[in-house]
Curated annotation (Swiss-Prot):
Source lineage: Bacteria, Bacillati, Bacillota, Bacilli, Bacillales
Any one GO CC term of the record: cytoplasm
Record field: transmembrane: none
Name listed for the protein in its UniProt record: Histidine ammonia-lyase
Presence of the UniProt keyword Lyase in the record: yes
EC number in record: 4.3.1.3
Amino acid sequence: MNLVLNGQDLTIESIKVLIAQDQNVEICEEALSRVKQSRKIVDDIIADQETVYGITTGFGLFSDVLIDQDKYEDLQLNLIRSHACGIGEPFNDDVALVMMILRLNTMLKGHSGVSTALVEQLVFFINQRIFPVIPAQGSLGASGDLAPLSHLALALVGEGEVIYKGVRQESSKVLQSLNRAPHTLQAKEGLALINGTQAMTSQGVISYIEAEQLAYDAEWIAALTHQALNGIVDAYDAHVHIVRNSKEQLSVANRMLDWLEGSSLTTRQGELRVQDAYSLRCIPQIHGASFQVLNYVKEKLECEMNAANDNPLIFDKDDETLVISGGNFHGQPVAFALDFLKIGVSELSNVSERRIERLVNPQLNGDLPAFLSPHPGLQSGAMIMQYAAASLVSENKTLAHPASVDSIPSSANQEDHVSMGTIASRHGYQIVENVRNVLAIECVIALQAVELKGVDKLSQKTKEKYEEYREFVPSITEDRQFHKDIKVVSDYLKRSAYKK
């Protein structure tokens, strides 16, 4: 089953399914008709020799320079060559794939003036899983993601690099091996490829998919810790959460009770102590707030995924043709959302690290051995895993600083305010990876802690998780290289975000 694109109703869930099931894309006929109509308008502009930005003129400061008609195609090719100034390591293959899908989807709205040949080239790259090599640094997030999208565009015309079947190679060689011609850019098409927010948005989509799964995984991992510390279940009672008027908080509380149902390790208030520390007692409030952030981010990302963020935009309404220069390429809405994502997801690791501390600290972990060491003194046990978690959490605090509060003028001060949304997206994904590793550390330690408490006392649902993860995380019987355990759990958690 293919993902049908129409420029209007693409969702994050559909992207997730496409990645998980290795789906292809196809274009609905109505959308293709819109593409053809908008291209006809561009062709008419050229035939009538009208002065229109980016079609018959130069770009940015050169917008007043008229271009000779026989140079229109050169103009577009020069644009993507000169703008391909990306720096550093490339976005991963999933981000490159989503970037192509999102750029294609916005063209299908019929406001970009591209040819059906360009649409078909994007479909070919997507379905063949030819991933453009797109350096992740170098975008200001307005006028859109110019540098990253220029690298994407280069691949389509056979001048860039791609990853194909796991091998980094020249795009021209891959196209030749597949008997596919490079695309020849027509008037407006270079600009239509690079004027948009698809780099920041695609990285944001991948961050969201993985962060959402981590938010759910954080609950069962916390439930293991809760049982290891004989946590009090009363704090998750629905009465408490209904009066907070937060559906996300209530949902987390209900799921925590579900994870803990039937456990003989949990306690009631007053049984061992009256109250738990906040990192246990306030899981619904903290994790629930993160879900609120995720819901907000999802709404903003899906809005942008189906937006026309080209410039200029072409309209054909009521027999009137309009070509309007605007600023839909400005990434401010996405930048704000991704900065919010950074904060909301960071807190999942912040509170996780505090639970880790309670598991390993002999002054806080009840009758568990210090650092869960099999032989305290001779063996350090989980001591440095807590250090690693603390380091990642502190790094997240720096990364969570909002990128969108910064701006720097560019293009001779014509583009005098920019979003920095792509910086927010890159930092956001680094935070997601850090959070995943912190939760992996809590998981490794909590597995050992509940084993010491007695696996038979666990709730049925968390016992199943214990058994699942013990398949590849052995008990701690002596000191070993725990970084291997952390990595295998982190990788497993990541794969769970894309389960088929």
